Regions:
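Short acidic capping loops at alpha-helix termini that bridge into adjacent secondary structure
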Residues: 130-131, 160-162, 214-218
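Short Gly/Thr/Asp-enriched flexible loops that form oxyanion-binding sites at enzyme active sites
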Residues: 83-86, 145, 205-210
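Venus flytrap/periplasmic-binding-protein-like
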Residues: 95, 156, 198, 208-218
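Residues that mark the start of a beta-strand
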Residues: 13, 129-132, 192
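Alpha-helical recognition/docking segments in bacterial nutrient-uptake
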Residues: 9-122, 126, 182-188
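Hinge/beta->alpha junction and helix N-cap segments in small-molecule ligand-binding domains
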Residues: 18-28, 46-55, 77, 99, ...
């Protein structure tokens, strides 16, 4: 089969570079991609970049060396990076998953993050809180900017206190650290809180679990 693949230039393998294998959202995407690929006679190779640019560049070259027929990626590379443009110019199709890439260059399969965060935030405004917090990560990423924009759009005309915190990574530990720091600074729970990912929310719950009971409102 491998020799036949070399002759036909098709290996019936696909690559998927995701930011974090422990992130439940990406784990589910990987599972669905693998199931879909297998049903169509393809093998899906999965690797985690740990949301680090150098690791991601190494992985995309690895998948190119494996002669994958296409590459799916949730990229952390800046828009100015030419790695994927160069890869696609050499004949490897690149499809962006969850994190949008240049629409004139790449196909992207993404959610409407701005609208989703706007709707989520709006749902917390009745009854009107005095204070609302956004906990996110990686503010330089398009996906983070879209979610933060949706948060701010929902708060147009809001006169209460708005706090925005961004960490260095989409991780449970980062969510916990951000929430712990917030609680130490405020000395109380915020009236309303939005997180930009499930994994950050897990960390927030960890921090709330350890928050002293005497500090919690009855």
């Amino acid at each position: 089969p491998q020799a036949a693949g070399l002759r036909s230039r098709h290996t019936r393998t696909l690559g998927f570079i995701l930011p974090d294998l422990e992130n439940p959202s990406y784990a589910r995407i990987a599972k669905l991609l693998e199931q879909g690929a297998r049903a169509r006679g393809y093998q899906l190779l999965i690797a985690s970049s740990d949301d680090e640019a150098d690791s991601e560049r190494q992985l995309l070259q690895l998948f190119r060396a494996r002669r994958c027929d296409a590459l799916f990626v949730a990229s952390c590379l800046p828009a100015s990076d030419n790695s994927y443009r160069e890869l696609q110019a050499k004949g490897l199709p690149v499809i962006a998953i969850d994190r949008v890439m240049e629409p004139d260059q790449f196909c992207s399969v993404v959610s409407d993050d701005r609208q989703a965060c706007q709707q989520l935030t709006s749902s917390l405004l009745q009854p009107l809180p005095k204070q609302i917090v956004l906990i996110g990560a990686r503010p330089e990423l398009n996906i983070s900017q879209e979610r933060a924009d949706g948060f701010r759009e929902a708060l147009q005309g809001f006169t209460g206190e708005v706090i925005v915190e961004h960490g260095e990574s989409f991780s449970r530990d980062c969510g916990r650290q951000l929430m712990e720091q917030l609680l130490q600074r405020l000395g109380h729970l915020p009236d309303a809180l939005v997180t930009t990912s499930y994994v950050l929310l897990q960390g927030v719950f960890d921090a709330l679990h350890d928050f002293p009971l005497k500090s919690r409102p009855l």
